[in-house]
UniProtKB/Swiss-Prot annotation:
It comes from Bacillus velezensis (strain DSM 23117 / BGSC 10A6 / LMG 26770 / FZB42) (Bacillus amyloliquefaciens subsp. plantarum). The lineage of its organism: Bacteria, Bacillati, Bacillota, Bacilli, Bacillales. One of its GO terms (biological process) is protoporphyrinogen IX biosynthetic process. The keyword Cytoplasm applies. This is Glutamate-1-semialdehyde 2,1-aminomutase 2. It catalyses: (S)-4-amino-5-oxopentanoate = 5-aminolevulinate.
Length: 429
């Protein structure tokens, strides 16, 4: 059995210093009935805690580290940039370079604006949609998390799902009234909402692959149906690709599924592990943003050279072949864990999209938030503890997906399968 004594002591101190002892709720490990594990360093596919325990890491800082921890090229480039200055409050050439790369790879993006977080990206995209259309309402989907902006904390997923909060105190009723929420993968509900409110719907925001109720891909025709309805009613289609961007495919989820939105929100991978966000889209829409247009948005550290450099170095190392390797690794992981779970009578369902993996403790297909909630959370908590003790670091929430990196090896996958086999054997007794 591993020792977590230093982590326990650090958490005890942290609880006196920060709300709940953490700076983001899911890190509190509440849904797995554990104290948080405090990390110290990472290299490649491995992460090490302050007690000296080593783990194969499938959290990867919640997605950004698609090359693994402390990638040599990323680290060296950051050292060089930091020596010249971490931020200037002025434009730099590296902003142009990352913007050109994003525009080249993301089908919907003709112009892009950099910000400092995914939440900033989605909040700004909603303001732009409202300003561009002159309408008020936003349609979103149950269990889809788009950051902690007031308009979007209505039946959100992710940590909100883990805590069992359908929304958050502090969100004014007037704001909530302008957010319409319908089930994911349910076009009929979308059609009903448009028939009722269509003239005042500014935009539809959706994760093209839901990543905050576990991993839930779109059913065939769902994204195209959204594209058709938004065009019919004059609303904007907004893809929140903060998580899926450059994780599902070389050209993001929109490239993989062949559906082009009006606006796209990005984050995580495009910062290479540093705080970042971006939103972009059609030029005529994006030109409404200040200083080109009247819709205001700004940020002190937007486009800072550290985040831009880390993002640029990360994206430059990704190739179409990288995503073929993700499929091979994912196939091996799914086949091995499914076989082990079945052998011990463990209910399970896998959902996958590129380098994103959802593993649910239910035999039912998981196509929306209601189905995701059917997963056995007590069984997940037992599995989580067992895997941590076996040296596998997973997201401490059933409603978060696993992430693969280019640094993960087939040996890592095999060791993960062997660990799962032993844990399933133990928890099935």
């Amino acid at each position: 059995m591993r020792s977590y004594e230093k982590s326990k002591a650090a958490f005890k101190e942290a609880q006196k210093l920060m709300p709940g002892g953490v700076n983001s709720p899911v890190r509190a490990f509440k849904s797995v009935d554990m104290d948080p594990i405090f990390m110290q360093r990472g290299k490649g596919s491995k992460i090490f805690d302050i007690d000296g325990n080593e783990y194969i890491d499938y959290v990867l800082s919640w997605g950004p580290l698609i090359l693994g921890h402390t990638n040599d090229r990323v680290v060296e480039s950051l050292k060089k940039v930091a020596e010249n200055g971490t931020s200037f409050g002025a434009s730099t050439e590296v902003e142009n370079e990352l913007a050109k790369l994003v525009i080249d790879r993301v089908p919907s993006v003709e112009i892009v604006r950099m910000v400092s977080s995914g939440t900033e990206a989605t909040m700004s995209a909603l303001r732009l949609a409202r300003g561009y259309t002159g309408r008020n309402k936003i349609l979103k989907f149950e269990g889809c998390y788009h950051g902690h902006g007031d308009s979007l904390l209505i039946k959100a997923g992710s940590g909100v799902a883990t805590l069992g909060l359908p929304d958050s105190p502090g969100v004014p009723e007037g704001i909530a009234m302008n957010t319409i929420t319908v089930p994911y993968n349910d076009l009929e509900s979308v059609a009903l909402a448009f028939r009722e409110y269509g003239e005042d719907i500014a935009g539809v925001i959706v994760e093209p692959v839901a990543g905050n109720m576990g991993v839930v891909p779109p059913q065939e025709g769902f994204l195209q149906g959204l594209r058709d309805m938004t065009e019919q009613y004059g609303a904007l289609l907004i893809f929140d690709e903060v998580m899926t961007g450059f994780r599902v495919d070389y050209n993001c989820a929109q490239g993989y599924f062949g559906v082009t939105p009006d606006l796209t929100c990005l984050g995580k991978v495009i910062g290479g592990g540093l705080p970042v966000g971006a939103y972009g889209g059609k030029a005529d829409i994006m030109e409404r943003i200040a200083p080109s247009g009247p819709i205001y948005q700004a940020g002190t550290l937007s486009g800072n050279p550290l985040a831009m450099t880390a993002g640029l170095e990360t994206l430059q190392q990704l190739t179409p072949e990288s995503y073929q390797e993700f499929v091979k690794k994912g196939d091996m992981l799914e086949e091995g864990i499914s076989k082990a779970a079945a052998a011990h009578g463990i209910p399970h369902t896998f959902n996958r999209a590129g380098s994103m993996i959802g593993f649910f403790f239910t035999n039912e297909p998981v196509i929306n938030y209601e189905a995701a909630k059917s997963s056995d959370l007590k069984l997940f908590a037992k599995y989580y503890k067992g895997m941590a003790d076996a040296g596998v670091f997973l997201p401490p929430s059933q409603f978060e997906g696993l992430f693969l990196s280019t640094a993960h090896t087939m040996e890592d996958i095999e060791n993960t399968i062997q660990a799962a086999e032993k844990v399933f054997q133990a928890i099935s007794r």
